[in-house]
Regions:
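Individual transmembrane alpha-helix segments
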Residues: 170-202, 208, 382-385
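Extracytosolic (periplasmic/ER-lumenal) interhelical loops and adjacent juxtamembrane/interface segments
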Residues: 146-186
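Juxtamembrane helix-capping/reentrant segments at transmembrane boundaries
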Residues: 41-55, 106-117
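Short juxtamembrane and helix-loop transition motifs at transmembrane-helix boundaries
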Residues: 42-51, 81, 104, 180-189, ...
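Alpha-helical transmembrane segments
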Residues: 1-30, 35, 63-91, 120-146, ...
Length: 403
């Protein structure tokens, strides 16, 4: 039974969920007893009067423990970079939360230091995948039968190191970073790997920050991440199974089945954490959790060569990030012209849906000041964002067959 990946994955899922639920209860009591709770909250971002002050934070510790224990028990430590990612981002987020809670500095870790930490981990992962002899694929190719001229999908017999990744809506589902850099002539292979490492750094940094921005309402980030983790686990499974890889016309990645166990533990930890993080939250994951889950999603997608599916799969994270970027740039543009202006009532975009008219700045021009016309309770906003992520997850899976 131990050789069956499905058996070990289910065990990892259940144990992660149970650890998260059991440990969470005791962790919340400990944090309350020590008074390690939210102490700095702007009432303006809480239009429904939900009392956030006094709720323990740093719940990401629960998530990290719930992921690591099942992976160490039921997984093989071949994919050590997933464990490294979890610990690295956990420490980065913990440092940020520590400064906020214990040093009473609401800004936390300096943004440049946070970005630097994310980029360093991205660089480590990118270089590891470049240097490791185990990071190989068997490329999917299309051949035409001589008898009936029909096309069939086969995989090359020898595993190779490759910069090929899965891309949606293209006929053969593949994109090679090396081919993109073909203009470099004899140096295209080195240039292709350099581009791959750069993309790795950007993806990990972007997804980690996107998850961090999405963590603004009770249960929001945990629910969205559980859905995304489920899809990535499914993609890891079909990538590790040569028959499924043939059917879906995607590359076969030997050894990626162990990532299914990690993804299962990740989903279990998220669902278990929701037991306490669902509205009204008894604990917040803090940056210890949000940075970690974003980093895990980014690294997992890169290892299974599905990072170009993330703009669709993590569409909610993408929209949250873009809303903040556009809001800041539009505000700066107006400031240079001496005009106080904003695109949205508030960002990240999920906050835009719960702002009351009385909370708007009367001296500011809002491009979308009438959208939406009325405020929505945060629990309903959260569920609607989950539904959006479910739809995006379904579309992501569908793209594997749309060419």
């Amino acid at each position: 039974m131990w050789s069956y990946i499905s058996f070990r994955s289910l065990l990892a899922f259940m144990l992660a969920l149970l650890i998260s639920a059991w440990f969470g209860q005791h962790f919340i009591k400990y944090m309350r007893r020590k008074n390690f709770t939210e102490t700095q909250r702007d009432a303006k971002i809480d239009p429904f009067g939900v009392q956030k002050i006094g709720v323990p934070s740093m719940g990401g510790i629960i998530i990290i423990a719930s992921i690591l224990v099942p992976c160490l028990l039921f997984g093989r430590l071949r994919n050590i970079y997933m464990l490294l990612t979890t610990v690295w981002f956990g420490l980065l987020g913990f440092l940020d939360d520590y400064i906020k809670i214990f040093k009473h500095n609401k800004d936390g870790l300096h943004p440049k230091a946070k970005i630097a930490g994310q980029m360093v981990l991205g660089l480590i992962v990118g270089l590891t995948l470049y240097l490791s002899p185990d990071a190989v694929i068997r490329e999917n190719i299309t051949k035409t039968r001589t008898v009936d001229k029909s096309e069939v999908i086969i995989h090359k017999s020898e595993p190779v190191k490759s910069t090929i990744t899965t891309i949606p809506f293209f006929k053969n589902n593949n994109l090679s970073y090396t081919e993109i850099m073909s203009f470099c002539g004899p140096y295209k292979n080195a240039a292709g790997w350099l581009l791959f490492v750069i993309v790795t750094v950007l993806v990990i940094t972007a997804v980690s920050n996107g998850a961090n921005l999405n963590d603004g309402m009770d249960g929001m980030a945990a629910g969205n991440s559980a859905i995304i983790g489920l899809v990535l686990g499914l993609l890891a499974y079909v990538s590790s199974h040569i028959q499924f890889a043939n059917y879906l016309n995607i590359m076969y990645i030997p050894g990626s089945q162990e990532l299914v166990i990690f993804a299962s533990a990740f989903v279990g930890a998220m669902i278990g954490f929701l037991w306490y993080n669902a509205y009204p939250a008894q604990i917040f994951m803090g940056d210890t959790g949000s940075l970690t889950i974003g980093g895990i999603i980014g690294v997992l997608a890169i290892i299974i060569h599905k990072e170009l599916l993330l703009p669709l799969l993590c569409g909610v994270f993408l929209v949250e990030s873009l809303s903040v970027i556009l809001q800041v740039e539009y505000f700066k543009l107006g400031k240079r012209r001496g005009v106080k202006q904003r695109l949205f009532k508030r960002t990240p975009i999920h906050d835009n849906f719960r702002v009351l008219p009385s909370q708007l700045d009367p001296d500011c021009r809002y491009v979308f000041g009438n959208w939406p016309r009325s405020a929505t309770h945060e629990s309903k906003i959260t569920v609607r964002f989950w539904i959006a992520t479910i739809l995006l997850a379904a579309l992501t899976i569908i793209t594997l067959k749309i060419r």
